[in-house]
Amino acid sequence: MKQDIYIRIKAFDCSLLEKCIREFIDQLKQFNADLSGPIALPRKDSKFTVNRSPHVDKKSREQFEMRISKRLIIVHNPTSTMMKMLADLSFSAGVEVDLKVKEVNI
């Protein structure tokens, strides 16, 4: 049985996301990891509309937008040292990392 690690990285700021991905891939390439990605996943856009005034002027509104960019990196056949490095890795504020280990039947 082989294992794959699916690493999903999310951030509000696209430039911060790309910087973290570069650092992440550089760390993995030190271990000669077999990688797929980064794969761009669909961006999630959320819009919020609020009233400017608390009492009157219903027509006066303000809109805010939040964009969440996502990338996926797949590590094939990770070693135990790679797993330890992934567990100890820290990212800057505003970047969310989700790790999933999947068994692959061949």
Curated annotation (Swiss-Prot):
A GO BP entry: translation
Keyword Transport: no
SUPFAM superfamilies: Ribosomal protein S10 (SSF54999)
Keywords from the named record: Ribonucleoprotein, Ribosomal protein
Gene3D superfamilies: Ribosomal protein S10 domain (3.30.70.600)
GO MF, one example: structural constituent of ribosome
SMART domains with a match to the protein in the record: Ribosomal_S10
Any Pfam family the entry gives: Ribosomal_S10
Keyword Ribosomal protein recorded: yes
InterPro entries per UniProt: Ribosomal_uS10, Ribosomal_uS10_dom, Ribosomal_uS10_dom_sf
Role description: Involved in the binding of tRNA to the ribosomes.
Protein name in UniProt: Small ribosomal subunit protein uS10
Species: Wolbachia pipientis subsp. Culex pipiens (strain wPip)
